[in-house]
């Protein structure tokens, strides 16, 4: 009888301790590591519904401080992103270095022309698949910058050629695409 009672007490104790440990992982009052915060920022950026191929946001997390960088096409995106990130558990402060691109009909036309030229081209069309296309097109007063990720140096070069041929940009295309070879698993 005593051993059965002791066994039940141990099981209940283990369940209580286990649920307390599980609660600790979701408790927003607990300190978060920079890696935890970074995962949260990445998740929020991937699920932000208004982030488009014409916006580009990057971030850095250090000691609970999130620094945001990049360009967006609308002021509401800048404030939305800032507010969303500021509410993440563990975030101490947000340094907002996001630039709002000027409103320009000419830039909007150029964005659409370049997007069509890149994403309708057979060797680059795969980068437009899914909810988050990997090539971003930033147009600031006619100056074009390509950001994001491609699989090969050839795709990076083709994207530059397609962007150059698409419209009347002011100056050369600033190609900041990163080449990341896909894993073969």
Model-inferred region functions:
Residues 2-11, 15-185:
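N-terminal targeting leaders
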């Amino acid at each position: 009888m005593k051993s059965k009672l002791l066994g039940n007490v141990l099981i209940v104790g283990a369940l209580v301790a286990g649920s307390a440990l599980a609660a600790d992982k979701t408790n927003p009052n607990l300190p978060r590591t920079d890696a935890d915060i970074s995962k949260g920022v990445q998740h929020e950026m991937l699920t932000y519904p208004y982030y488009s191929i014409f916006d580009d946001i990057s971030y850095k997390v250090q000691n609970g401080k999130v620094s945001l960088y990049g360009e967006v096409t609308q002021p509401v995106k800048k404030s939305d992103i800032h507010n969303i990130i500021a509410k993440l558990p563990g975030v101490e402060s947000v340094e907002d270095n996001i630039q709002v691109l000027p409103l320009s009909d000419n830039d909007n036309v150029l964005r659409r022309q370049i997007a069509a030229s890149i994403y309708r081209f057979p060797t680059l069309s795969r980068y437009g698949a899914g909810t988050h296309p990997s090539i971003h097109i930033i147009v600031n007063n006619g100056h074009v910058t390509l950001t994001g990720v491609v699989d090969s140096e050839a795709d990076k070069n083709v994207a530059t050629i397609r962007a150059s041929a698409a419209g009347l940009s002011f100056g050369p295309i600033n190609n900041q695409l990163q080449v990341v070879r896909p894993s073969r698993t």
